[in-house]
């Protein structure tokens, strides 16, 4: 997600909780796709691989799948530009019956750590996060690091169901090579897509 140190050094936290009825997840007609970082915020950088670029590649693959299904998509960025965390949430809050999916890749100073994990804040986000975790790690053949609740700004400030997906650790040399392949990016996007469809 663009850090080698603690997560809270890179993402502002907001106190509070947004309560959303679980039924909303079944009614979404719009998916807000949020490729993490971008522009001056490059995210993690290991072995010549920049997280912000990987995030955008997976996001575009997901957008293609959703559009083929006839689902409206909104990208918080389409190129290597900076978009503030609050602005990302603001974009999401401009749509009704939407879900928000923030796409990231992880990093740690402990280069042995690897795997995929999904974060949520509200109760509906937890359902979507669980659906993603049941698919993405198995299909991408990486360790399942589980579902976690964390107060990232983009999760707390959005009024719709929201999740943040960490697709793998680019600080781990073997996982970084796999994450850099088109196969991995397409497989991760398909797993997220199938999870969203299962929650719809």
PLM regions and their residue ranges:
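Sec-dependent N-terminal signal peptides of Gram-negative exported proteins
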Residues: 4-23
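Residue-level recognition of conserved structural "scaffold" positions that shape functional pockets
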Residues: 12-15, 43-46, 175
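Active-site-proximal helix/loop segments of hydrolytic enzymes
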Residues: 26-30, 49-200
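Short glycine-rich His-centered loop
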Residues: 29-48
């Amino acid at each position: 997600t663009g850090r080698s140190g603690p997560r809270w050094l890179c993402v502002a936290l907001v106190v509070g909780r947004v309560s959303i009825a679980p039924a909303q997840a079944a009614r979404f007609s719009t998916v807000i796709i949020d490729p993490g970082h971008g522009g001056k915020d490059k995210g993690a950088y290991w072995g010549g691989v920049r997280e912000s670029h990987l995030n955008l590649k997976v996001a575009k693959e997901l957008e293609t799948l959703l559009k083929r299904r006839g689902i409206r998509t909104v990208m918080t960025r389409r190129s290597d530009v900076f978009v503030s965390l609050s602005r990302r949430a603001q974009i999401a809050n401009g749509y009704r019956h939407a879900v928000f999916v923030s796409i990231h890749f992880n990093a740690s100073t402990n280069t042995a750590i690897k795997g995929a994990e999904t974060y949520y804040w509200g109760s509906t986000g937890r359902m979507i996060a669980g659906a993603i975790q049941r698919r993405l790690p198995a299909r991408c053949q990486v360790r399942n690091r589980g579902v976690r609740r964390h107060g990232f700004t983009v999760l707390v400030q959005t009024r719709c169901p929201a999740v943040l997906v960490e697709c793998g650790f680019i600080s781990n040399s073997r996982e970084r090579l796999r994450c850099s392949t088109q196969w991995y990016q397409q497989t991760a996007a398909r797993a997220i897509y199938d999870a969203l469809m299962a929650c719809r």
